[in-house]
């Protein structure tokens, strides 16, 4: 087993697997498990192929450490400007959200231990702690992420051990909403749960000695792990509660509180899981932004650090809770970044490439030809329609 590639797949998974996973049953339970599972499989397939397209663009663009260089060498200056603007907007939104979420969680954990802490101090402490690992490079993040991911999956397994005995066939077969239009509207929410594209340029550069088959397997494994976790969690929650109960929860805390009444340890376990999910997501996104800043702005570590961590930290302090409403637009930004831009890059590259490219063992080309590209375009358009 190639542990470097396996670790890279876990970085992909850790970036996609966020605390938002806990909310998936609240969105899908009402539609029943059959259609929820089908939609999740379609979204996973679409995002995985789009990730493979970006992997192709990165592997065919030598010495590209960030999406800035990849865009410049594929879709020109205009495309590069659009890509960078969307990329920065998305990553800043994501980092601010993770800082806000992590700080709130840290404050709550310390309150349980009767230690009072201001939210501002918690934000600074989390950012300084997590950023220390990011500046050490992709190799350190890879090794740390493997450890964090192991503990995160362990917490999920413990939760399932507690929940599985309470599952009933009646709950698993329930459907309270037959409106397929409303189900379709949840597509973008699920899409953001599978999106790990910001880290792909860094991981392709990190695994520059990998063969094209290894790069493909890295992306596929990094997509399948979140899919399995989401489905298992969805089935466990739906099997224990009625759809009406789940859909009436206003936030994740209500869900956790309901399960806490059944088992006193589940609140602690899910709090640990949420903490680890936030940290792994932060590390992946921060790594992508840090490498992007090195690639685009400066190789000076101080300048890069300020642009990567201090600006989102200031944003978290200024925006506070109301900023979370802006994250609703992140799905639209992500459709362009994760679907349309990789598609444009690959179409441009394939027009220029020679037979030598196909014979090179280290240059990856996504399978499927023009049909797969057309289906990817349709997938992206449908995601945009679901937002209207």
Swiss-Prot record:
Signal peptide: none annotated. Gene3D superfamilies: Amino acid/polyamine transporter I. Keywords: Amino-acid transport, Cell inner membrane, Cell membrane, Membrane, Transmembrane, Transmembrane helix, Transport. It comes from the Bacteria. One of its GO terms (molecular function) is aromatic amino acid transmembrane transporter activity. The keyword Translocase does not apply. Its main location: membrane. It is found in: Cell inner membrane. The chain crosses the membrane at residues 5-27, 31-53, 86-106, 121-141, 147-167, 186-206, 218-238, 268-288, 302-322, 326-346, 368-388. GO terms for cellular component: plasma membrane. GO terms for biological process: amino acid transmembrane transport. It is a multi-pass membrane protein. Pfam families: Trp_Tyr_perm. Seems to be involved in glutamine transport. Complements an E.coli glnP deletion mutant. Belongs to the amino acid/polyamine transporter 2 family. This is Glutamine transporter 2.
């Amino acid at each position: 087993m190639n542990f470097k590639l396996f670790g890279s797949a876990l970085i992909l998974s850790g970036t996609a697997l966020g605390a938002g996973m806990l909310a998936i049953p609240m969105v899908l339970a009402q539609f029943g498990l059959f259609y929820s599972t089908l939609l999740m499989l379609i979204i996973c397939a679409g995002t995985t192929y789009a990730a493979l397209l970006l992997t192709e663009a990165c592997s065919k663009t030598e010495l590209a450490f960030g999406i800035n260089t990849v865009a410049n060498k594929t879709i020109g200056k205009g495309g590069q400007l659009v890509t960078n603007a969307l990329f920065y907007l998305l990553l800043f939104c994501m980092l601010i959200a993770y800082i806000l979420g992590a700080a709130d969680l840290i404050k709550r954990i310390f309150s349980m231990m009767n230690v009072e802490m201001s939210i501002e101090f918690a934000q600074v402490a989390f950012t300084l702690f997590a950023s220390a690992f990011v500046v050490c490079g992709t190799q350190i993040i890879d090794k740390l992420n493997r450890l964090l991911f192991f503990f995160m999956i362990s917490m999920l397994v413990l939760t399932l051990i507690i929940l599985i005995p309470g599952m009933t066939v009646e709950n698993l077969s329930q459907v309270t909403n037959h409106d397929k239009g409303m189900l379709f509207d949840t597509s973008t929410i699920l899409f953001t749960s599978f999106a790990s594209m910001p880290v792909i340029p860094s991981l392709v550069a990190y695994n520059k000695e990998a063969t094209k088959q290894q790069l493909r397997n890295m992306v596929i494994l990094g997509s399948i792990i979140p899919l399995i976790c989401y489905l298992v969690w969805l089935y466990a929650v739906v099997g224990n509660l009625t759809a009406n109960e789940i859909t009436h929860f206003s936030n994740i805390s209500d869900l956790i509180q309901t399960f806490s009444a059944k088992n006193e340890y589940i609140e602690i376990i899910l709090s640990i899981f949420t903490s680890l999910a936030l940290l792994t997501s932060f590390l992946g996104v921060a790594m992508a932004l840090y490498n992007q800043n090195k690639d685009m702005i400066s190789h000076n570590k101080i300048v890069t650090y300020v642009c990567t961590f201090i600006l989102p930290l200031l944003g978290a302090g200024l925006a506070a809770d109301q900023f979370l409403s802006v994250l609703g637009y992140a799905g639209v930004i992500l459709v362009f970044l994760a679907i349309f831009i990789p598609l444009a890059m690959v179409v441009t590259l394939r027009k220029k490439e020679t037979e030598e490219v196909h014979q090179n063992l280290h240059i990856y080309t996504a399978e499927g030809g023009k049909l797969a590209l057309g289906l990817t375009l349709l997938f992206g358009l449908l995601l945009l329609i679901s937002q209207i």
